[in-house]
Amino acid sequence: MVEPSEKPNTQNDDVSKQEIRNPVSSSSSTSDKEKVAKKGNSDATKSLTPEDLDAQLAHLPEHEREILKQQLFIPEVKATYGTLFRYATRNDMILLAIVSLASIAAGAALPLFTVLFGSLAGTFRDIALHRITYDEFNSILTRNSLYFVYLGIAQFILLYVSTVGFIYVGEHITQKIRARYLHAILRQNIGFFDKLGAGEVTTRITADTNLIQDGISEKVGLTLTALSTFFSAFIIGYVRYWKLALICTSTIVAMVLVMGGISRFVVKSGRMTLVSYGEGGTVAEEVISSIRNATAFGTQEKLARQYEVHLREARKWGRRLQMMLGIMFGSMMAIMYSNYGLGFWMGSRFLVGGETDLSAIVNILLAIVIGSFSIGNVAPNTQAFASAISAGAKIFSTIDRVSAIDPGSDEGDTIENVEGTIEFRGIKHIYPSRPEVVVMEDINLVVPKGKTTALVGPSGSGKSTVVGLLERFYNPVAGSVFLDGRDIKTLNLRWLRQQISLVSQEPTLFGTTIFENIRLGLIGSPMENESEEQIKERIVSAAKEANAHDFVMGLPDGYATDVGQRGFLLSGGQKQRIAIARAIVSDPKILLLDEATSALDTKSEGVVQAALDAASRGRTTIVIAHRLSTIKSADNIVVIVGGRIAEQGTHDELVDKKGTYLQLVEAQKINEERGEESEDEAVLEKEKEISRQISVPAKSVNSGKYPDEDVEANLGRIDTKKSLSSVILSQKRGQEKETEYSLGTLIRFIAGFNKPERLIMLCGFFFAVLSGAGQPVQSVFFAKGITTLSLPPSLYGKLREDANFWSLMFLMLGLVQLITQSAQGVIFALCSESLIYRARSKSFRAMLRQDIAFFDLSENSTGALTSFLSTETKHLSGVSGATLGTILMVSTTLIVALTVALAFGWKLALVCISTVPVLLLCGFYRFWILAQFQTRAKKAYESSASYACEATSSIRTVASLTRENGVMEIYEGQLNDQAKKSLRSVAKSSLLYAASQSFSFFCLALGFWYGGGLLGKGEYNAFQFFLCISCVIFGSQSAGIVFSFSPDMGKAKSAAADFKRLFDRVPTIDIESPDGEKLETVEGTIEFRDVHFRYPTRPEQPVLRGLNLTVKPGQYIALVGPSGCGKSTTIALVERFYDTLSGGVYIDGKDISRLNVNSYRSHLALVSQEPTLYQGTIRDNVLLGVDRDDVPDEQVFAACKAANIYDFIMSLPDGFATVVGSKGSMLSGGQKQRIAIARALIRDPKVLLLDEATSALDSESEKVVQAALDAAAKGRTTIAVAHRLSTIQKADIIYVFDQGRIVESGTHHELLQNKGRYYELVHMQSLEKTH
């Protein structure tokens, strides 16, 4: 095979001693400093354009380029508004047609009233000229007033049908989009996820689908009603007198031009805002899912700033969008008022010329007033439609993407009897997300059926890639993989994955019971449809085989125990054993073990390894291992170095060869002579002793007491303050959820976000008031205009003069409205986007401030919190920006209109005002119902979003289990539940909304009947009547408009209460508290004095039971023991993630609970089992170890050299500026771990905590890193938790834990001589040559 020209020419022996280097060798002219300076863009979550992809893959041959492109390319969907309805069923479309007709009919009701109004105007003139009697006048007046009542009833029914129908259809279609989106996500190839963060999926499935729902629900009905009003009004105008109507229609062209020109900018800004929020969501998801790491390093501030970078970008585009909408609204109001002026001016000329009469002009003018006013109601909704289209384009681009490797496809063959012979022929592999690195080069390997083949080698050498290729997570760029002589590309993918069981290095469990988690292994197997009894037997049998049965039965709920999100309620070893049980329960033909026992302690590993050895008999097994003791008995051991096979053979053959394998063995060898005790005896002993307790959180805190009597008595004797505070804390948590806030408190709280904008907000309020006063002023001009047109023919000269004057006044009013509306639009855009920015930023910081116990609660899962950040902050803006400005504007309109009406005709005004309280009551009641509905709906969507996030972040496990259909069933069930719950609430709230909107007709009927009577008696003149009526019409409509914003206000109230609760929550261990003694220097003595501990979320499970432990300054101590025995808990207590229930942890004789937590933690550094990296460059990730930015490059380089990662970093094209991807996805486990170690070392800590710090490293790297850690530990107090005993044999003291107590302690030599528990653990990990 021809190698690419960029590949280094030589493969020297050093390669076996370090990570595989990047084949694209960096330019020698680039200095270290320059590399560090090159800041990489975190664009891992952006969908790539074809041009971007071609540029990235330009260095590869064409056929390789095509293979990688297929795995990465996301089509760009040009979404239109119609695209949003692509999943509407025939019933949906019929319902849409019905409710659309109802909306249109409801819109036609208001212009029909102008016909009645024009008719009455003629009647008023007749009575004034004594052409009809008072009785005749009264009869006509009563009949027309009844017509108003009929119109009101019709509009009530039509609006109710329209609102309920649109909300129902909107929710129904959005539900399908959510389901299709998750379905599409689950069908994508793994390379797609290497580019897409889990946080972005959460943002799409919550915030973006909510935007679509907003754009296809009740706002469509409101818009259709407004448009119908507009067109009906103009049709009526044309029927009455076409010339005048035609002249006024010219303004429509101006409106269309304004809306069309501005909406292009609106759509672009909306799209860019969503992109920025998606990237921010991924950062938030990364940080929240690794909160322990962020807390340990005190990097909350730095990570919050990283999140804010994306928020600022979103704020920039959001402001542009809102400003353009403000200017558009101002322009439309100006055009509308100019239209009035034009109508009056030309109408007066047609009247004088005898071409039409007063009745027709009044009808046309009023129709134009109402029609033009209604178009203003369309503008606020255009933003919702634009956002929906932008969100739709992003979601549909994923839905329409045809995956290169599609697990949902029915294509491909199956093999009737699988034997299990696997062959890799001429494999060359490049990961799609890192096209510059060749991971595998010319691999030829046969895995015989029924045999065990082990893969070993340095991390990053391509071992796990074998699993990825066999499972078809990726397609190789050259060569093929064969199963029983058939190319796996020709086989059905779902069927293929069902023949293979995979246990990976970091096991993923789902948020359900232990029983259901193991049962997932049966998907697609013949046993899946057996009886419940048979399935139960299989599951228990698999759990026993995997050495999980005993610990499961030790749990209060046994197999029905819920494991929590991603299994966080179990320790690493417990999770791993459940995963093994899941893998073997279906008796698979092919078993893949990718570091399957790496998370187990030595005792468990011995038994589980024996179980795996038994399970692998008679089936094809591929084992990937760093710990070589686990693969001694393999039929063939393949050593992979630098993406190539270096050597292969049995353990004995390879040891005799004295090649690379022997070097790996030597690195892990424990140099002690051991007795003759057989491993079998140790295994039997292990089975007897394995009973122990789970060491992590569960659901709720009831009390701080122990059910265990001895311990309870002990606690009663101590009766510490902390034990009491734990009880109080649990009670406080119970109360937290019940906290209710008054509306005033919440408004003050929301206003606090805009404190810096107070002055410009006052300007905005000033302009909003001026804008609001425009409507009543227009009523005065309108009444004056009608009075002018009522003048008799003898005064036509004065009529022309007055008409000219009032037409000019309308033009002036239009110009004033252009300035005031645009100004308030721009001002509130600044305020609204600042509010969203600060709310997101502060709530993210409030989350990062919380203690670890907060994140252990099931309702605070990563998905729920990420979803909260994306959706609730958007809802909060329901009382800011455009909404707040509009509410203030229409409130001013209502107040000024009613005041003017009272000033000019108090009798008629008082009668009309009497109806306004009823309107207000309807609106407020609807607001209250929507707030209730919002709270309930949010909870349902939150749980479904959290579930979707969990499924996506575990995509490899979902894919290998072929669990896609099961995930979809649960998700669709959650969506259906939510839809059923919301329908009843919608029906109630829509009833009140329809009432509040149609009540204005009853108000008009009353006003016309009573006012007409006053006019008929000669008590009022035409000016007073028309002024009062038009003021009340617009006043009532304004009240109706305020309540059309109720959904936004309802959401805002619900969101504000959630925010207030989060902000008011003061954690027990508060990083923002200045209290406590600050430590300038630390000696490093650490003591545990009779420490008892249970996790707050699982109080019935004791974890530490009277732990006593002393670490002297500079001492290196190691903690070993079975998983779940309390080792990692000890580290967590040293870090003060939790407070002890009784007893205390002391540093230099000081109780750590009385120290300032930030000051205390600054002297510690933690390297945990699962390395956590964040989006950004390698340099950024190393610098997260310190809380300052001005760290010299030399210090960064030194830390990386000490962690044995410097050479690898410098071999990358961008050096320290290399982007690590979402959660460090661009790097191997070993590379990530060494960067995490560099991050700890740059901190120069006095106390070093190593929680399985080298478990992810291969033997070669481990030896070097361990030496570096040993060197780093000098002069430092070091506590190391280890499963691999070769890493801690030089420890000053080794403590052996069992069930929360220390059962043995001493040096490595002393403990071996004791021949106790430690001796047994060492014996199991022996790497002696088998005989």
Swiss-Prot record:
Loss of function: phenotype: Impairs the resistance to itraconazole of the azole-resistant strain TIMM20092.
Alphabetical keyword list: ATP-binding, Cell membrane, Glycoprotein, Membrane, Nucleotide-binding, Repeat, Transmembrane, Transmembrane helix, Transport
Highest taxon above the source species: Eukaryota
Membrane topology: Multi-pass membrane protein
One GO location term (cellular component): plasma membrane
Residues that span the membrane, as ranges: 93-113, 147-167, 219-239, 242-262, 325-345, 358-378, 762-782, 808-828, 884-904, 910-930, 995-1015, 1025-1045
Expression triggers: Expression is induced upon exposure to amphotericin B, the allylamine terbinafine, and itraconazole. Is highly over-expressed in strain TIMM20092, and azole-resistant strain isolated in Switzerland.
Comp. bias regions, Basic and acidic residues: 31-41
Keyword Transport applies: yes
Localization per Swiss-Prot or TrEMBL: Cell membrane
InterPro entries in the record: AAA+_ATPase (IPR003593), ABC1_TM_dom (IPR011527), ABC1_TM_sf (IPR036640), ABC_transporter-like_ATP-bd (IPR003439), ABC_transporter-like_CS (IPR017871), P-loop_NTPase (IPR027417), Type_1_exporter (IPR039421)
Disulfide bonds: none
Domain ABC transporter: residue ranges: 422-667, 1086-1324
Gene3D superfamilies xref list: ABC transporter type 1, transmembrane domain, P-loop containing nucleotide triphosphate hydrolases
GO biological process terms, semicolon-separated: oligopeptide export from mitochondrion
Binding site for ATP: 457-464, 1121-1128
Residue ranges constituting the ABC transmembrane type-1 domain according to the UniProt record: 97-387, 764-1051
GO molecular function: ABC-type oligopeptide transporter activity; ATP binding; ATP hydrolysis activity
Pfam families: ABC_membrane, ABC_tran
SUPFAM superfamilies: ABC transporter transmembrane region, P-loop containing nucleoside triphosphate hydrolases
Record: glycosylation sites: 293, 529, 860, 1108
General function of this protein: ABC-type efflux transporter involved in the modulation susceptibility to itraconazole.
Family the UniProt entry places it in: Belongs to the ABC transporter superfamily. ABCB family. Multidrug resistance exporter (TC 3.A.1.201) subfamily.
Additional remarks: Dermatophytes showing reduced sensitivity to antifungal agents have emerged in several countries and, in particular, up-regulation of MDR2 expression in some clinical isolates such as strain TIMM20092 leads to increased resistance to itraconazole during clinical treatments.
Protein name from the UniProt record: ABC multidrug transporter MDR2
Source species of the chain: Trichophyton rubrum (strain ATCC MYA-4607 / CBS 118892) (Athlete's foot fungus)
